[in-house]
Design a protein with these regions (language model features):
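Active-site recognition of the HExxH zinc-binding catalytic motif
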Residues: 24
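Extended charged
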Residues: 1-15, 76-155
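Alpha-helical segments that scaffold the active site and NAD(P)H-binding pocket
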Residues: 73
Length: 155
């Protein structure tokens, strides 16, 4: 198994930073460069579709050693409240694979769905199989909505 940081479901704390938007973007770019534009949780490498995770959960603590590059899929797991705001995900029950593996699968499905022909058809069928796992999440967690889970997780 790859040596990735564990992905933990959670909610983000809002930043109360003295940094301007351009300052924080500059800091983020330095972190991305330091991490070679590679997600520390799944290994996905891209100059786009990355964000930073604050190791201590405090988005106001913008020291480089507190920040890690994460892809947008991994980042959303740590910030379930943002998932519901962006309407970009839902909860499924899929214990057979690791979360980071699901993220690689989701990216592949996303890319294949925008193509034409057999690849797109296979991607749609794969997505249908994953969506079928929502019911198990509802049974076990009481919901498949990240917003509801994020509300339960709030202190």
């Amino acid at each position: 198994m790859a040596n990735y940081l564990p992905i933990t479901m959670g909610i983000g704390r809002k930043a109360r930073s003295a940094h301007s938007d351009s300052n924080i973007n500059e800091i983020k770019q330095k972190v991305f460069e330091r991490d070679d534009h590679t997600c520390k949780c799944c290994g996905f490498k891209s100059q786009k579709y990355q964000d930073v995770l604050f190791k201590n959960g405090n988005a106001s603590d913008t020291k480089a050693e507190n920040m890690l590059t994460t892809c947008i899929f991994c980042h959303q797991c740590f910030n379930l409240d943002a998932v519901s705001e962006m309407r970009s995900g839902l909860l499924i029950w899929l214990p057979e694979i690791q979360q980071y593996q699901l993220h690689h699968l989701a990216r592949a499905i996303y890319v294949a769905r925008i193509s034409q022909g057999p690849m797109a058809d296979a991607a749609r069928r794969s997505l249908d199989v994953l969506m079928g796992r929502r019911e198990e999440a509802k049974e076990r967690l009481g919901t498949d909505d990240p917003r509801i889970l994020s509300m339960v997780l709030k202190p």
